[in-house]
Amino acid sequence: TAPVVARAIKRDIEERLPQNLGALASIGQTFRSLAEALPFGRIRRDFWSRFYFSKGPAAYDAEGVAGAKRVLHELLAEFKSASPKPGHVDFVGAGPGDPTLLTHRARVLLHEADVILHDRLVDRRILELARREATLIEVGKTGFGQAMAQDDIHHLIVEHVARGAQVLRLKSGDPTVFGRLDEELEAIAAQDISYSIVPGITAASAAAAAVGRSLTRRGRNAQLRLITGHDMAGYAEQEWRALAKPGAVAAIYMGKKAARFIQGRLLMHGADPLTPVSIIENSSRPEQVIRAAALNALTEALQDMAGPAVLLYGISPQSAAEHVFQPREADLCR
C-alpha cells in the first residue's frame, strides 16, 4: 500500500502547485540579490509568494521568461514603495516539552515567525519547527542562576517589532502561568504594539497525566493551587495552614531548590509527614522521571535530580509502591 499512498500524495502536491513552478524558480533565483533590498521577514516572504503563486504563473504563461522578469521588477517596485507593515508579537505556550503536545496554532506561528525569543526550557525539537531563516534568541532564566534581565527581554521584543518583524515570544508551558506575561504585556502596551496570546499545556497538567492522576477529585479536594517555590524576593510564602490540611492539593512550580523550605513550612503548620508528593522531572520528554515521596522524605528524593521538575503535593502516582522514598532515621529525628 505504501507505493499507492506515495503516488497519491505526489499527485495531490503536483495538482496544487503551478505547472510552471520549476521555470519560475529558475527565474527567481537570478533575482534574489535584487530582492534583498526588501526588509527581511514577512515583506520579503510576501513578495516571493505573490510572484510564485499569483502574478508569476500568469505572466509566464502569457509572455514566457520576459513576462516573468517584468512582473518581478513590478512587484519589487510595488513592495519597495509600500508603507512598511507594523510588527506584531505572539505570546505562545510551548507546552511541557513533547512537540506533539503543541497546539496547531502554535505550530503555525512558529513557522511564520521572523524572530523567536524563547525560554531556556523550550525543547530543542520544538525550536527545530521554526523556519530556517528565523532568528532564534534564548532569553532563558535559571533558578538562582544566570538569567537575562526582564527589562532586556522587553527591549528585545520592542526592538524587533519596531523593525516590522513578526515576533514569537515562546514560553515553556502556558504563558499565563508563572511566565511573567503581564510584565511583557505592559512593556508592549506602552508602545501600542499588537499582540495575541496562545495558550499551551501547563506543566501541572502534563505532570498529572504522567502519574495517571486527576488534579481534582470529588471528596478529596475542591480546590487546586498552582504555587511557585520562589519569587522575586526569594522563597515564596504561601497559605501554609490551608495547604497543611488533609486533602489539600497543589502543583508546585520551581520547587526543587525551595523543597526544604516548603517541607519545613508545611510540617510546621501541621501537615501529615506522610502526605504523598509526586515528583515529575522533565515531564512529557523522553528523559522523564517519576518519583513518589512522603513529605518528610521530599528533600532526599530530590537530591540527584538535575532537570526541571513539578511537585504534585497531595497526589501519589498510580503505581508508586516501588518508587516511594522513605525518610532515614536521621531525617525523622530533625
Residue ranges: model-predicted function:
Residues T1, G97, L121-D123, V139-A147, ...:
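Short, acidic/turn-prone active-site loops that include or flank metal/cofactor-
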Residues T1-E15, S33, A66, D123-R125, ...:
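Adenine nucleotide-associated cytosolic modules
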Residues E78, K85-F91, H111-I201, A206, ...:
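Class I S-adenosyl-L-methionine
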